[in-house]
Amino acid sequence: MAAEKGGSSDEERKPLTRGGMEYRDSSNSLHYSSSAASLSLAVIDRINGSTHDTGPDEIGRGDRDYSDDGEYDIEEADYIPSGGKPVQKKVKIVLGFLLFLCLSGWSLAFVLFLFGGHESSKTSIVYEDNISDTGSQGIKITLDEVFDGTWSPNSRDISWIPGPNGEDGLLLEKGASISNGYLRVEDIVSRKDPKSSKKPIVLMQKAYFNVSGEAVFPSRVWPSPDLKTVLVLSNEEKNWRHSFTGKYWLFDVESQTGQPLDPAAKDQRVQLASWSPRSDAVVFTRDNNMFLRKLSSNEVIKITTNGGVNLFYGVPDWVYEEEVFSGNSVTWWADDGEYIAFLRTNESSVPEYPVQYFVSRPNGEIPKPGGESYPETRKIKYPKAGAPNPIVDLQFFDVGKDEVFSVDIKGDFADSNRLIIEVVWASNGKVIVRSTNRESDVLHVAVIDVFSRTGKIVRKEDINALDGGWVEPSQTTRFIPADPDNGRLNDGYIDTVIYEGRDQLAYYTPIDNPKPIVLTNGHSEVVQAPSGVDLKRGLVYFVVAGNEPWERHIYSVNFDGTSLQPVTNVSESSYYDVSFSNGAGYAFLKYAGPQVPWQKVISTPANEVTFEETIEENNHLSERLRQYTLESKIYQYIDIDGFSLPVLERRPPNFNQTKKYPVLFYLYGGPGSQTVKKKFNVDFQSYVAANLGYIVVTVDGRGTGFIGRKARCIIRGNLGHFESRDQIQAAKIWAAKPYVDESRISIWGWSYGGFMALKTIEQDGGRTFKYGIAVAPVTDWRYYDSIYTERYMHTPQRNPGGYDNAAISNTTALANNIRFLVMHGTADDNVHIQNSLTFIDKLDVNNVHNYDVHFFPDSDHSIYFHNAHKIVYSRLADWLVNAFNGEWLKTYDPTPNDSILRRAATWVGMSI
């Protein structure tokens, strides 16, 4: 697609209804690359567009611009006027009367402003970023470029790997040139020193190998801890968001040959496999049963035998995969390789939800003759709010005794009221288990001793009583072994705790001590901490939301809470991510914005060796920024009801304070989430601002993360109430700005953001927001999964009024909006299409028709099937342009004028 050059880049997209009355049509839009990046909940993150000077994320459309030099008059051009011929005298009288009304209104408004009460909100600008300095002469970004990778930063995938003899700073690299090996382990320091005696260890010379005439092409690889064997996955097929199946192989490094993981069933698909810390065995799950393959034998040991449709061993069911572990494994080896802990999940009582496929057949089965015309139905055990949950308990396998057992914990939650959210092996047969009640507001931390087969609860925290909040499931607890030589007399662990209204880092020692040493405190909150632990030097590394919530910086602190030190330059407003080597002597530092992202490997400050190597600089993006025109970004706060809320405003290039711009609000808004981030990101919002010429505003309202638990927890039991108020109040603030056209304000979101878009326009009733767009929205929280929903809403049985209030149900208010759009995939296994269908039924029952709808056959929550992802954003852009150009206003009073009547009369042979 040819790029646009020249012209005033602050112009809005020209109304498609002018000059021919052509309706904006998705079918003639963009030509997308087939390599569009994938979107899921991770997609939502990308759509949410981080915050920085980059730009587009979604739609690119049309080549015509127009200058928006004044407010759009619905009576001009091709809009349909009322009938009758103009009478000059009457016009003068009317105009004079209108002028009198305007002057009176302005005077009254001025008096009210001086003496009346003001809205309890204010704005304060903190940062303004504009990394594109081409002005109006730069090339405009297109929607194609947003999705074809043109603006995607290159990102090297470097994995740290522990050395077999305790070496630190080893990297696992995959996909290197054939001459250097396809899979190899390299010492980070020696790779810059040609004289070093530490040479790379080549694990796999080639990118494939043969087993009995079958070519095996690895999709994923896991070296054994001793680096002598590689566990290889091939023929991978996706299951749900994080899970997959495939064929597993064992590849011998010395001989460069492979064999099936299970020689007796090499073609059967395996759900999960993982190495023993001793490198002598692999545990795996197939058909929901667990097996053990010892490398000393070709025989496979059955650990469980009764797994099946309703009983899972070692792998999570749908809801635990999606809402608790965000992964495909619930299997944990003890560090000595003597025991395996795993979850047993019983779904017998969980109701099923049918997902239908009208075009494809995901199960791969050919229908019987006569059945070709029927859709394929996949039934998922999906616990909706208030429905029975899967029963989950922790089991253990004694490798030496070939025995499965469980351990009872006195005072623990009942089976039906328990969520197991984390399992961490300690030393000497001890296991740390974190669990919550069903509504996720009471936390139990238990310690189990597998030697004595006993367990006890060592910590209880009633989060609901503490601040009315909840426990977010996470898997970041880090075991800290005793080391008397370094001052650690007892085992312990590091966990994230609530301290003075924010998430902070704490160290518990001994392991059964309920009172911690708080390691961090203050205004900032830790993020998925800890990120790394240096046991030798007694240091914890972690990521923190910096001086402002949209930042991320790296810090370290001693185990005793002293010597809190920044690793990154905290004087700069930046966004970093990091991964640490096994011993935390080195860090893979990833700068994500606001400028062009880069990646470096560095030695950590406590390391005696000083090292730094740039891995990626993304020079191609720096060059592109010199050619293109992007939006400017304003990071600021607004105060609403006493809460200071982060806001990102994206302004079109060549922004003109004297013009009137339409405004699109974009949000996600889910509990604990964050959309206002200071990252380099060219996304759909960038496209809307930099190409279409609209302002885009994102507000992280109450309920979102990193603004304190008081603001976060206020939403509990009443999702959508405070969040929608924040969006409405923010829209009022922007509507009052001199450069905003208050008649053209819209809002859009996906998933939770779709729910928020609908809830906001429902609560606003057309007073501030005139338009709304919801993609894959929840419309009634009774239809969403139990673990997520009840965490924030309690159960429907306990909180029926809250569920009623949260549902999108006020059709009268929705009818007061000019128009809204709903899009949904029919095979969405996450937010079921039931949400949109029942919502549309409410609209039909109440004779509401000011909306559009688009369903995508066989698409899941990310909406990708058969070109659907392109169509989502093409449709979104088309619809938005038409909305802001008054297309839907024509339906308000569709009275034909005399020209239309004359044409109709001519067509039937009459004369007027």
UniProtKB/Swiss-Prot annotation:
Residues linked to a glycan: N130, N210, N346, N569, N656, N810, N897
Annotated region (Disordered), positions in chain: 1-29, 48-68
GO process annotations (BP): proteolysis
Entry GO terms, CC: plasma membrane; vacuolar membrane
Matching SUPFAM superfamilies: alpha/beta-Hydrolases, DPP6 N-terminal domain-like
PROSITE patterns noted in UniProt: PRO_ENDOPEP_SER
InterPro entries named in the record: AB_hydrolase_fold, Pept_S9_AS, Peptidase_S9_cat, Peptidase_S9B_N, Serine_Prot_S9B/DPPIV
Reaction(s) catalysed (UniProt annotation): Release of an N-terminal dipeptide, Xaa-Yaa-|-Zaa-, from a polypeptide, preferentially when Yaa is Pro, provided Zaa is neither Pro nor hydroxyproline
Domain of life: Eukaryota
Assigned keywords, A-Z: Aminopeptidase, Glycoprotein, Hydrolase, Membrane, Protease, Serine protease, Signal-anchor, Transmembrane, Transmembrane helix, Vacuole
Gene Ontology terms for molecular function: aminopeptidase activity; dipeptidyl-peptidase activity; serine-type endopeptidase activity
Record field: transmembrane: 93-113
Extent of Basic and acidic residues compositional bias: 7-25, 54-67
Assigned EC number: 3.4.14.5
Role according to the record: Type IV dipeptidyl-peptidase which removes N-terminal dipeptides sequentially from polypeptides having unsubstituted N-termini provided that the penultimate residue is proline.
Annotated active site: S751, D828, H861
Vacuolar side: 114-912
Subcellular location, record wording: Vacuole membrane
Pfam families linked to this entry: DPPIV_N, Peptidase_S9
Membrane topology term: Single-pass type II membrane protein
Stretches of the chain found on the membrane's Cytoplasmic side: 1-92
Stated name of the protein: Probable dipeptidyl-aminopeptidase B
Family: Belongs to the peptidase S9B family.
